Amino acid sequence: MLQFSSQQMVAIKNKATQSMIDAQKNDNEVVLNNPVLVPEDGRATWNLYYFFPEHGVRLTSARDQPLSHICPVDGKEFTGEPYDGAWWRWLNGLNAKACYDLGLLWQITEEPIHLEIVREILLEYANYYPNYEVHGGIPYNGPGKANAQTLCEANCHIDLARGYDFIKQALTEQEQDKIEKRLLREGAEFLMEHRSAQLHNHEMKINATIGVIGLILDDHRYIDFALNTDYGIHYQLNHGCLGEGMWFEGSVHYHYYALQALLNFEKIAHSTPYSVSNNPNYLKMMKFPLKLVMNNGDFPRLNDSIAGQEKLTHAHLFEFVYKQTPCEEFAQVLTNIYQNISRDNIDALLYGVDELPNAEPIKCQSMHAEQAGLTICYDEARNNSMLLKHAPYGGEHDHYDRLGLILNRNGKEILPDLGTTGYGAELHYGYYKNTSTHNTLVVNQQNQSPINPTLLNYQQNEKFTLVASEANWANKPAEVDSHTLVQWNEEAYRDVCFRRAILWLGDAAVELNTVINPHQQQFDLTYHVRGTHLANEQRKSIVNPLSGALERMRDVQLIESQTEFTQCYAIEGQPEFNQHFAADREVDVVTGYAPDNPATSDIAYSLVRSNQPELKTVLLHDLSEKQTYQLQKVIWCEKQVEFSLLKSNLTRRFRYNQANNQISELAE
């Protein structure tokens, strides 16, 4: 066995608790309690088809009902494709996971049933795998054999290979030869053929699987391909890591998804000459996202992030990396993970230190990362936070939301980033992945074309913080060394320039926006608030004028020709939330409701509409508990704006210079 030495295995056996063993059995009860079932052909497709189109929630499945798929919200049954193929993908995943988990259990408990199940699964796949038809058709993805995409092939094969390593000693030479030739080598060769020449989390997974198979089979050709070729592991780390340590795709989920692949390789390779721990971006990438934990305890749902993936639950990564490279950050994140759950788990058993130090949990912190393009401002006393996304374009998993905004008040998301749902659900491409469902500028209700923003200024002192950035579509379009599908409209954004500065005061955030719109397109400054609109007698009901993702918006109302107004919202469990707005020329305001995430509830939208060649706005987001802020005395000049903020009889006056993007506080 390559994964653990005999001495390590003895120590693991001695430390294993019955609850750990029971947890492993429970996680694999479907395979343990049913006859082994392996598809005879390549009928499996894609697990992300397994979502209800309307609610965007994952369907429920049963091992004995491969043709019946149930929505957990309303009990509706779905049959046929794409759900049947997704069910078989689920089963392939269960089988592969069982190979690893039950193979490990056999090493710990020596119970024959675990060995027999793993042996049968591996031999059955070895029977069929060479003859599985290549099939695919998944957006952005290469094909598979057992499944419909190359990524899924890699995910299954890494568990099949590690499971084989656990039981190899108990197999006959003929069985070993069959599994190695007809399953593991067939899989590695297929993955090598279909690895794409791109930076991508998929390629990290594919490389890791090829490398693990190479380590287990002692095949240096596989190892070298995985590590050292163009688009291999080191290439991905060297070119896919942005300056401060963020994975270029801009999603915290896919950042750790790429690292999960890397660590699956490193857990076997760390004591060999093939360890990747000497790559300087390895630890940078492990540490950087920990700076993005918001004051609700979660990561922001930037870009593609399915509900639930924002949670900090990465024991499988940090147990290992803390033991290999102990430091305060990794001790802190393990404190977070184990705040509400026991450490009596398999990752701590296999890879963790015997006892963790007493460490403070990771907390939200103010952070400015110019190259990653993320700025967080945090007021600890009031538990408020703000995130401005001025990140470069990230490719497939991007959400076309440059200069997007997130606001949290007292630990609760007020202006959230919704993330997304399963990619097979209509709501993914039809709603969540669109510019118009983010707190940013939308032109003609079309998606922003790829652009890399420019940071204009970052100004911080004891009284306030200012961050200013610009997305200018007159500049060269953004490019990324990763496959993309065109899901944007270049013509809509041609020559448009959007400048957004945020003045952070701790209990308020003030937006200073400029939109340059030379071709006089219809544009919207869009805000969605996790709350409900309070009544406003000025609003009148209208037929929804919006196209695209917000065509589904309901209860649409309009206030016309405004230069100053206030939007008020009721927030569950908190006081009201107010937005005070001023513009240098008249705008219309459209309000309504569209899906939150999950789509079982709605979120309140406010769209500030104009088609003027230029618009300047000031927007005060009142994050105070008593909602006592007022926006007053806004004076527009050609290159600057002055405004006053009144709170509890205290007035503060500011001047923002749009020529140099500096802000100063004036004496009243």
Predicted regions and their residues:
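Extracellular glycan-targeting catalytic surfaces
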Residues: 1-198, 204-211, 286, 539, ...
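Long, repeat-rich segments with strong aromatic
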Residues: 230-269, 506, 521
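Active-site-adjacent structural elements in folded domains
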Residues: 84-86, 143-147, 173, 189-198, ...
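Carbohydrate-active enzyme catalytic cores, enriched for enzymes
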Residues: 211, 217, 253-415, 610-611, ...
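Alpha-helical cores of eukaryotic small-GTPase signaling modules
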Residues: 209-236
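Acidic, mature catalytic/reactive cores of soluble proteins
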Residues: 68, 73-77, 90-93, 100-104, ...
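Inter-helical turn/loop segments and adjacent helix faces that build the functional surface
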Residues: 109, 167-178, 217-221, 268-277
